[in-house]
A protein has these predicted regions:
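Non-catalytic regulatory/gating segments with a bias toward low-complexity or hydrophobic composition
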Residues: 1, 54-56, 74-76
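Extracytoplasmic beta-strand/coil segments of soluble accessory domains associated
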Residues: 1-31, 52
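Solvent-exposed loop/turn segments connecting transmembrane beta-strands
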Residues: 6, 66-68, 94-103
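Envelope-exposed proteins and targeting segments
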Residues: 10-12, 22-24, 42, 50-52, ...
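Hydrophobic, lipid-facing positions within transmembrane beta-strands of outer-membrane proteins
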Residues: 12, 70-72, 103-107, 155-159, ...
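Short acidic/polar hinge/loop motifs at secondary-structure boundaries
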Residues: 15, 31-59
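Flexible glycine-/small-residue-rich
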Residues: 18-20, 28-30, 58, 78-80, ...
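Periplasmic-side early beta-strands and strand-to-turn transitions of outer-membrane beta-barrels
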Residues: 83-85, 90-98, 108-193
């Protein structure tokens, strides 16, 4: 499995055994998520707090999940409450070149019983700029340690209602509202290849 940023929109995408997101659909709690225009998805827009697991199916996958699973499927699941009452609140601050450039804040509340659970959560990740290395100071990449057109702002809210009448049965109703905005910095290199490999993982 390979994560990379590519394309004119500089989107983070995943490839499984050479297949991209059009042959390896991404699901969020079992619901497919993609852009109808071209079938792709910017994975960098998915906030990671309140996530329980990332399930990767390579090769054969269930037909109940729908079409376009030539290379497999990826299912991102949210956490479920394990206590009668749960609450969390978090804040993280990012720094670059001695300047605050980003922050991440999130809050969640959950209640559960033998019959089911209710979970409400919200989060925001805002980035003002990406830092540049020392010595980089030009009109294309950026000046004063700030890459131009590199800001991003993502917000997400989730309401999840679960019903567990028996030990092995679970029925959930999930509402997700997510808004995301990002700028696209210009390419400042001297090569026509615009793909940057970020990570390689074996599953």
């Amino acid at each position: 499995m390979v994560l990379q940023k590519s394309g004119s929109r500089n989107e983070e995408q995943v490839k499984v055994r050479g297949f991209d997101s059009r042959q390896v659909p991404v699901y969020f709690d079992g619901v497919p998520i993609y852009v109808p225009y071209d079938g792709n998805l910017d994975l960098a827009r998915i906030l990671t707090n309140n996530l329980g697991a990332v399930e990767v199916s390579k090769g054969y996958s269930s037909l109940l999940q729908g079409p376009n699973q030539m290379g497999g499927a990826i299912n991102i699941t949210t956490q479920k409450p394990t206590k009668p009452l749960e609450a969390s609140l978090g804040y993280r601050q990012g720094w670059s070149r001695s300047q605050d450039n980003a922050y991440d804040m999130h809050a969640s509340f959950a209640a559960s019983s033998d019959l089911g659970y209710l979970q409400v959560s919200g989060s925001q990740l805002k980035q003002d700029f990406l830092g540049l290395p020392h010595g980089v100071n030009n009109d294309i990449a950026g000046k004063h340690g700030k890459m131009i057109n590199s800001s991003a702002d993502d917000k997400r809210g989730i309401v999840k209602l679960g019903f567990t009448p028996r030990e092995n049965d679970e029925y959930t109703l999930t509402y997700i509202k997510q808004d995301g905005e990002k700028d696209n910095p210009p390419y400042s290199g001297n090569s026509g290849q615009k793909i940057t490999l970020l990570a390689v993982a074996r599953v």
